[in-house]
């Protein structure tokens, strides 16, 4: 801890987001960068007034260097432009976003940087990475909540009653790799 306190546990679940405080910073598990397959690495988002055209679905629209989402909610509409900074700058991406929203913006646009990929191992030693600490696939298919839930279910199924069985750890990592790779390949098909 920052104050020098040491915390001991049989198992740590790293839910610390993109930083991966335990899995990456403490244990050094590397991140597999999948940007050569999924080049989008930034999103600019802005809420706007809800349109009278309230649709019960999310709309995804292709653009030159990425795509735009429109998510109608009860009191507003969520909008965002996901793009690759190798092919478009922020100013152009924001201009495209604001030109294609259905109402007046309710806030200033904000940007979110991300890198598509996953940790080489989601379970290493006595640490299991869940959620963004384990990996992120671009938001075209919103799989983050699914990956958290399936990771926890997988952990519960494979968690031994005492000690860590290397076969269970290996199986957890194998199943996690397979799931991330299947989702990655599905997203690639969109492009």
State where each predicted segment sits.
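Conserved FAD/dinucleotide-binding core of flavoprotein oxidoreductases
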Residues: 63-115, 133-147, 158-165
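A short acidic-Thr-Gly-centered motif at the start of a beta-strand
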Residues: 1-5, 118-125
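A short, acidic/glycine-rich surface segment
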Residues: 55, 116-118
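Active-site-proximal substrate-binding core of FAD-dependent oxidoreductases
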Residues: 154-191
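Residue-level marker for buried hydrophobic side chains located in beta-strands
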Residues: 127-129
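Predominantly flavin-linked oxidoreductase catalytic cores and closely associated redox partners
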Residues: 1-99, 152
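Short, internal active-site loops enriched in acidic
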Residues: 4, 115, 177-178
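A short acidic (Asp/Glu
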Residues: 21-25, 140, 181-185
């Amino acid at each position: 801890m920052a104050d020098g306190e040491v915390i001991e546990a049989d198992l740590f679940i790293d839910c610390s987001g993109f930083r991966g405080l335990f899995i990456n910073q403490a244990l050094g598990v590397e991140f597999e960068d999948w940007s050569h397959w999924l080049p989008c690495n930034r999103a600019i988002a802005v809420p706007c007034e809800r349109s009278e055209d309230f649709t019960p679905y999310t709309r995804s629209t292709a653009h030159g260097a990425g795509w735009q989402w429109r998510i109608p909610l009860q009191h507003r509409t969520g909008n965002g432009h996901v793009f690759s900074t190798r092919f478009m700058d922020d100013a152009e991406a924001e201009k495209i976003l604001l030109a294609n929203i259905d109402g007046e913006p309710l806030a200033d646009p904000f940007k979110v940087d991300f890198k598509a990929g996953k940790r080489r191992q989601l379970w290493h030693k006595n640490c299991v990475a869940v959620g963004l600490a384990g990996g992120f696939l671009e938001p075209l298919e919103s799989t983050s909540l699914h990956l958290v839930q399936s990771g926890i279910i997988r952990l519960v199924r494979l968690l031994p009653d005492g000690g860590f069985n290397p076969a269970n750890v290996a199986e957890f990592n194998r199943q996690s790799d397979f799931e991330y790779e299947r989702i990655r390949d599905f997203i690639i098909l969109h492009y």
